[in-house]
Amino acid sequence: MNIVLIGAQGSGKGTQAGLLTEALGLRHLASGDLFRQAFDEQTSLGMRAKTYVDRGELVPDEITVAMVLQRLGDPAYASGVVLDGFPRTIAQAQALDRGLHRMGRRIDIAAYLDVPREELLARLSGRYICRAAQHVYHQPARPPKVCGICDVDGSELYQRSDDAGEAVQKRLDIFFGETIHLLDYYQMQDKLIRTNGNQYVEQVLAELLDEFHHQMGYNKHSRYWPRFSLRSNCG
């Protein structure tokens, strides 16, 4: 199963992607992590991308798509993937479809986490991320045990510059002005599901999995049935 997860900054997309990979036994491919790894390893595509990033320019689609498809060609991703942060445009989605077709694969589901803009702003204003592994915390909803320190690896927590002020407004403008058109693209392919992202994390996950099983026709005997209990202590 290959899944595209669509959501604005602050929608909980990264959190749900991680949970879905565990529940469904898939791999998680986050575009931001892919770029960081390519820069660190100084791959040929990574170095080409870095020249644009260093100039403050957008990385051309041909490089971004090539990096994603190269990773998806790894045998470790053959059983399925949750794509997080890619594609961002219809052009990227079309290029992804063509590349997957050459591999004999396809996108099965595109899931949209629907969260009101005002809620996104409230979430982002209190979001903090650890420097080591990008674990996410929130004041006051999900604070760390020790102020400013990641519970998992003890690294420093920081607030991204694009999570505040005009920067976050601009990123949301881009999402609701451009990326949102992906919904129409996948709707026309009958692959789109919409999920209320303005719920507890466990509730969002349970709703996503229910939709996936309905869409794909899986039952509890399928290898895609969740690998852990989804019973929530919330509400």
Where are these regions (language model features)?
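Glycine-rich phosphate-binding loop of ATP-dependent small-molecule kinases
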Residues: 1-235
